[in-house]
Amino acid sequence: MTAYGVAHLRPPAQLPEEVFEYLERIQATLDPYGGKVLVHGAQVEVREGEWPGALVVIEFPSLTAARAWYDSPAYREILRLRADHIPGDLVLVDGCGPDHDSAALGAALRAAA
């Protein structure tokens, strides 16, 4: 099942040189795991709540692939280039399959409550 790496980042007004190096190197860390950047820093349109910062969404063929990428020596080597300069949150999450049914999920959650 397709999985995603989703990051909510809060970059400073001036990006340090380390961030540019990170950006130059990240795709090479994604390629071996089938990672594809779907959203990267585009302007978000906030409809509910607040959203300071930038959104990054990376697609992977599976949660196993996403975990392997994040834990890979190649990514660990560049992670600090971003993380030391841009605070944020990152999660890895499974996507929904083509047969996802929100109503059935709601019924199951109600029954379990």
What are these regions (language model features)?
Residues 67-98:
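A contiguous, mid-protein "functional segment" used to position or interact
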Residues 1-54, 61-68, 94-113:
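Short S/T/G/P-rich N-terminal loop/turn motif that feeds into the first structured element of a domain
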